[in-house]
Curated annotation (Swiss-Prot):
Descriptive protein name: Ribonuclease HII
SUPFAM superfamilies: Ribonuclease H-like
Location(s), subcellular: Cytoplasm
Cofactor(s) listed in the protein's UniProt record: Mn(2+); Mg(2+)
Gene3D superfamilies found in the cross-reference section: Ribonuclease H-like superfamily/Ribonuclease H (3.30.420.10)
EC numbers, comma separated: 3.1.26.4
Keyword Nucleotide-binding in annotation: no
Chain sites annotated for binding a divalent metal cation: 7-8, 96
One annotated Gene Ontology cellular component of this protein: cytoplasm
Domain RNase H type-2 positions: 1-185
Lineage of source species: Bacteria, Pseudomonadati, Campylobacterota, Epsilonproteobacteria, Campylobacterales
Amino acid sequence: MKICGIDEAGRGPLAGPLHIAGCILNKQIEGLKDSKKLSEKRREILYEEIIKNSTYKIVKFSAAQIDKFGLSKCLKLGLNELVDFFAPFEVKIIFDGNSKFGAEGFETMVKADDKIKEVSAASILAKVSRDRVMRNFDIKFPFYDFAKNKGYGSKAHIEAIQKYGYCEIHRKSFHLKHLQGILEF
């Protein structure tokens, strides 16, 4: 039975979207592994190869949607959408991690992005697509250096928030304890 791998990117950042990708490989691709263990250049090369040689879908949630529904609900909605999309393919669906976020129709596996090539491919799809969005946001909001930090809470990013406040892609529901009282939404 073929496998559909699912992984996400953008669960922990202070800013930007959440991307959840599902992928069925139609051809073997060399060099697949967890996206975090690949250079940005290598991820970009593999991303292009994956989209040419797979059936895939990427579900995206904006910072505003994450604030409105909550991260867990967005994950549940995204996982359900991917399960529905891939159901006709009669595949075994594996999601990286140990939580189903209330969704059904798939298995979870810790470190699946290291163990299962389809999950590695999904990891790359989610990461590269999200990183591209963050590079575009860097042009619109240059003070935050989103091209470099991808919205994560680096020291420079937190200092930029302290200096310039939050921008429209910051997750209002992700309060930084040491910034409370300094900044208001």
